[in-house]
Amino acid sequence: MSNAITMGIFWHLIGAASAACFYAPFKKVKKWSWETMWSVGGIVSWIILPWAISALLLPNFWAYYSSFSLSTLLPVFLFGAMWGIGNINYGLTMRYLGMSMGIGIAIGITLIVGTLMTPIINGNFDVLINTEGGRMTLLGVLVALIGVGIVTRAGQLKERKMGIKAEEFNLKKGLVLAVMCGIFSAGMSFAMNAAKPMHEAAAALGVDPLYVALPSYVVIMGGGAIINLGFCFIRLAKVKDLSLKADFSLAKPLIIHNVLLSVLGGLMWYLQFFFYAWGHARIPAQYDYISWMLHMSFYVLCGGIVGLVLKEWNNAGRRPVTVLSLGCVVIIVAANIVGIGMAN
């Protein structure tokens, strides 16, 4: 396995670790509605940081974006909006199925759809079937899916042992939302594929290869921001129990506390895709679809490890932890299989 591929896998791991940890600061926000908290963090992660970093990277910010036709920018934006819809559905999936089943189904579907649809759309799927390296990467995707399933099973055992239930369990509604979440969340993978002309243009301007994907986030995350912020603002305006004014009428120290934590959560959320871009840059072009598989499977891996570190599994008993550990090992094996496949 080449150093470039190894570093690509490593950066995807770092990005996934940030994704697994980003919600921790949000959990410490006090007396704010979820909508206010999510909006503050989202403005940082989806608008301020993408724009600021792109302004630093590009020699002429406005000239870069104005050089693209609407036919280039619109698919990137719409796939970003598609991802935004998946993001909203994620929370609803957890409500109706519970954390473990919801995450397992949603992540499993988005891993398959986001990974395999890209080469199908690009007409390259036959290369995966007819080459040794392609078959190895497909095997890695299958093994990763098995790993996600094992971790999901561990979560179910933990919830059963600790008496944790879904907020409003509804299997039919939950499954529909989980499938929608999985499909729509893959929009980020499709957006990165559609944004290749933007990456190439950034490279032509002399932007370092590690950073060429970052300017496209202005458009991708702009699409996601409209969906997420629109959802939050509509609820803040229409739901009687929610009030943006009330949330910002608290004691000044508490407002500062909440803003800083929300900003930190937004920063950590953005960093997952900052390092995703680094990892994506190191993956061979013919296997760039694997970036999504690495990100999603490592997200599950890191989520399990973070749960152990935070002692969330302390009262779950030995069996759930053993199953979780097995799932994590399987995901690590999957990453190595994919790495070997890409090297071939």
UniProtKB/Swiss-Prot annotation:
Chief site of localization: membrane
Identify this protein by name: L-rhamnose-proton symporter
Q: What's an example of a GO molecular-function annotation for this chain?
A: symporter activity
Show the GO cellular component annotation of the record.
Answer: plasma membrane
Q: Which organism is it from?
A: Escherichia coli O1:K1 / APEC
For membrane topology, the record states: Multi-pass membrane protein
Q: What does this protein do?
A: Uptake of L-rhamnose across the cytoplasmic membrane with the concomitant transport of protons into the cell (symport system).
Catalyzed reactions: L-rhamnopyranose(in) + H(+)(in) = L-rhamnopyranose(out) + H(+)(out)
Instruction: Tell me where it resides.
Output: Cell inner membrane
Quote the Pfam families the UniProt record gives: RhaT
Q: Give the family this protein belongs to, as stated in its UniProt record.
A: Belongs to the L-rhamnose transporter (TC 2.A.7.6) family.
What keywords does the record list, in alphabetical order?
Answer: Cell inner membrane, Cell membrane, Membrane, Sugar transport, Symport, Transmembrane, Transmembrane helix, Transport
The top of its lineage is: Bacteria, Pseudomonadati, Pseudomonadota, Gammaproteobacteria, Enterobacterales
**Residues that span the membrane, as ranges:** 4-24, 38-58, 68-88, 101-121, 137-157, 175-195, 214-234, 259-279, 290-310, 323-343
